[in-house]
Amino acid sequence: MSNCNAVKNLIVPGTFLSKSGDKSVDATLYKQLVGCLMYLTVTRSDLMFVVCLISRYMADPKEEHMLIAKRVLRYLKGTLDVGVYYKWSKDVNLLGYTDSDYARDIDDRKSTSGYVFFLNGAAICWSSRKQGIVTLSSTEVEYVATTASACHGVWLTGILKELGVLSSKCIDIMCDNSSAIKLSKNPVMH
């Protein structure tokens, strides 16, 4: 892979992965590659979604899964100079973003949700995982994702207050679903 061509995106938009596939690949090699990529997510939050996605197929990896794992390596080759930079500021600002897809996993129709928290513009905490439930609408998916990120935001606020970094102001969590935002402002019958 040292002589490979770099790519600008981690995964081709609109790609759907499935457990069924044409040809199996060496599971040990696949697990080693995914393990190394998981290690990189500690410092490269941009890898989180795709690495979590391909890690679902470690029991019986197919050729399409390995191709995406190799595409991540090609992406890394083109983004060696990318990093997270932390800058000091008297005014500390904690901001969260959350997003999810709706029933994108074609094997069990569960959704993937994720969040990222920024402290003064630099990512300090992030997650991407498959939801444990099957939801019935995109509003419900986004509401579940936002609730999970809010719970983590409460924990993160407590840690930052204990360290003396953050005052007692509220955290803003950004969500891109207007129905989920309205539901969170008026949680009638929820």
Language model: regions and residue ranges:
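Divalent metal-binding acidic/histidine catalytic loops
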Residues: 1-190
